[in-house]
From Swiss-Prot:
Function recorded in the entry: Catalyzes the reversible isomerization-deamination of glucosamine 6-phosphate (GlcN6P) to form fructose 6-phosphate (Fru6P) and ammonium ion.
HAMAP family found in the cross-reference section: GlcN6P_deamin
Name under which the protein is recorded: Glucosamine-6-phosphate deaminase
Enzyme Commission designation: 3.5.99.6
Catalysis performed (reactions): alpha-D-glucosamine 6-phosphate + H2O = beta-D-fructose 6-phosphate + NH4(+)
Family: Belongs to the glucosamine/galactosamine-6-phosphate isomerase family. NagB subfamily.
Domain of life: Bacteria
Keywords from the named record: Allosteric enzyme, Carbohydrate metabolism, Hydrolase
Sites marked Part of the allosteric site: S151, R158, K160, T161, Y254
GO cellular component, one term: cytoplasm
PANTHER family cross-referenced by the UniProt entry: GLUCOSAMINE-6-PHOSPHATE ISOMERASE (PTHR11280:SF5)
Free-text activity regulation comment from the record: Allosterically activated by N-acetylglucosamine 6-phosphate (GlcNAc6P).
Length: 266
């Protein structure tokens, strides 16, 4: 596992965006051989999306031959709702870059057959071979996507009941009213994430410090689903300074020295 220790949320977003752009450009995608990118929602990736849009407008990257798969979507929330992940992605990213509409894949939380929707999503991912890079965030309790504590580390795309803590955390997007936050969501599984060629998780804020410690210094444990990254051959965790407060000094020093060349120029 790589740990990229940075100072601020802005630096985390810039590093993540630069990493994605470098991966896309090195891949040299075409219509017949697209780059497949997994994407998250929420507050954490906003600085990364902003930086990606800026790099696109500066001519540094094209998304014309990029195919995206989003991590999750609420169940029962109309896609036109301002807090649906469909709306979030278009508002913060898709509407500002040159990605073709047919290359965008989002789970449908209003599908008449939820099980079929989840199966078809997995099959569509497999039809591209694999996701080349999956970017994600992490919850205070260590969940990735909506794989809440005690999720199977072999899980695939499915419906999940959201914990009360997750709904409280997300209520900030629903006028602070937890009762407006949907109780269920569709989410890719831990196994789906582990199938990606590379997984990059962004971690921001002191409230995520225990989750980061569990990921880096703890054991693989389904109560902290972020710890599954230890099983992945190409995992990258990009974090700001407040989120490192639970890490041992020697751990942080080790990764600072290891990644010194890779955190320049931010």
């Amino acid at each position: 596992m790589r740990l990229i220790p940075l100072t601020s949320a802005e630096q985390v977003g810039k590093w993540a965006a630069r990493h994605i752009v470098n991966r896309i450009n090195a891949f040299k995608p075409t219509a017949d051989r697209p780059f497949v990118l997994g994407l998250p929602t929420g507050g954490t990736p906003l600085t990364a999306y902003k930086a990606l849009v800026e790099m696109h407008k500066a001519g540094q990257v094209s998304f014309k031959h990029v195919v995206t798969f989003n991590m999750d979507e609420y169940v029962g929330l109309p896609k036109e709702h301002p807090e649906s992940y469909h709306s979030f992605m278009h508002r913060n990213f898709f509407d500002h870059v040159d990605i073709p509409a047919e290359n965008i894949n989002l789970l449908n939380g209003n599908a008449p057959d939820i099980d079929a929707e989840c199966r078809n999503y997995e099959e569509k991912i497999r039809s591209y071979g694999k996701i080349h890079l999956f970017m994600g965030g992490v919850g205070n309790d260590g969940h990735i996507a909506f794989n809440e504590p005690a999720s199977s580390l072999a899980s695939r795309t499915r419906i999940k009941t959201l914990t009360h803590d997750t709904r409280v955390a997300n209520s900030r997007f629903f006028d602070g009213d937890v009762n407006q936050v949907p109780k269920y969501a569709l989410t890719v599984g831990v196994g789906t994430l582990l199938d990606a060629e590379e997984v990059m998780i962004l971690v921001l804020g002191h409230q995520k410090a225990q989750a980061l410690q569990a990921a880096v210094e703890g054991n693989v444990n389904h109560m902290w689903t972020i710890s599954c990254l230890q099983l992945h051959p190409k995992a990258v965790v990009v974090c700001d300074e407040p989120s490192t407060m639970e890490l041992k000094v020697k751990t942080l020093k080790y990764f600072n020295e290891l990644e010194a060349e890779n955190i320049k120029g931010l």
